[in-house]
Swiss-Prot record:
Residues 94-104 have a biased composition (Basic residues). Belongs to the mycobacterial PE family. PGRS subfamily. Residues 1-60 form the PE domain. Residues 64-104 are annotated as: Disordered. Binds fibronectin. May contribute to pathogenicity. It comes from Mycobacterium tuberculosis (strain ATCC 25618 / H37Rv). This is PE-PGRS family protein PE_PGRS60. The gene is PE_PGRS60.
Length: 104
């Protein structure tokens, strides 16, 4: 046999707390909706535009070969700019360095 003991004051207090919590969450949702809907969508910035243009340039020869056409690339495609200094050449193996210095 089950027994249920309920205090009306406790139930009223719990319901009030839940209503307050619900209104707080609703206010937070409304406050966050403005800042999240104003974000740029993917592809609406300069970086995405540059990547799309580069992808178009690299996909163009593949598309032409699939279609069976041999067209020259238009002058609109440019390689990515070099950033920073060029890499230095790799060092030769240790035995080679030793002979080159004639110290061994």
């Amino acid at each position: 046999m089950s027994y249920v003991i309920a205090a009306p004051e406790a139930l009223v207090a719990a319901a009030t707390d839940l209503a307050t919590l619900g209104s707080t969450i609703g206010a937070a949702n409304a406050a966050a909706a403005g800042s999240t809907t104003a974000l740029l969508t993917a592809g609406a910035d300069e970086v995405s535009a540059a990547i799309a243009a580069y992808s178009e340039c690299t996909a163009r020869p593949i598309r032409h070969s699939v279609r069976g056409r041999r067209r020259s690339m238009s002058g609109s495609c440019r390689p990515w700019p070099q950033v920073g200094a060029p890499m230095r050449p790799p060092r030769p193996p240790a035995s080679r360095r030793c002979r080159a210095r004639s110290i061994c």
